[in-house]
Amino acid sequence: NELNPDFFADTAKILFELCVEIKEKCGVRIEFTDLGGGLGIPYRPEQKKVSYAEVAQKIRKIYDSIIVPAGLDPLKIFWECGRPITGPYGWLVSTAVHKKHIYREYVGLDSCMADLMRPGMYGSYHEITVSGKENFPKDCVYDVVGSLCENSDKFAIQRNLPRIDIG
């Protein structure tokens, strides 16, 4: 999940140079290159969306300086953009079914990591919205957990959220 435009420009430069090297050493003209995936989306509120225009401008500049002089123009460029196409458009709707008050405040949901694996598997961040309290102060700190008996079944750890009620 990369948000830095320079990452993609650096990747394109490496691939374009490889295309030129293959042509020079093997006499093979590459018809396309695949920049792969990784084009990110902001998961956290403080993250900024990657500028596609900036990424395209940087890649175009590198293309014009490497591919065109090497006689490989036109070179098709593919990109696997699954995350920006699908990532921002899914919602997991859950209900708080219990609370536990010990050394931390826990909120248990009727969902589990079988419904959304990324937080439990990689500790990835996903925004949590408390329905009807979108503009309320986030003055409570919760561990939001799933319904499996599994220590990694967590949606959020020590997350500032509005007060969550059961139901």
Give each language-model segment a name.
Residues 58, 67-68, 72-166:
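Charged (often Lys/Glu-rich) extended helix/loop segments that serve as interaction or gating elements
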Residues 1-100:
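Active-site loop/helix belt of alpha/beta enzymes
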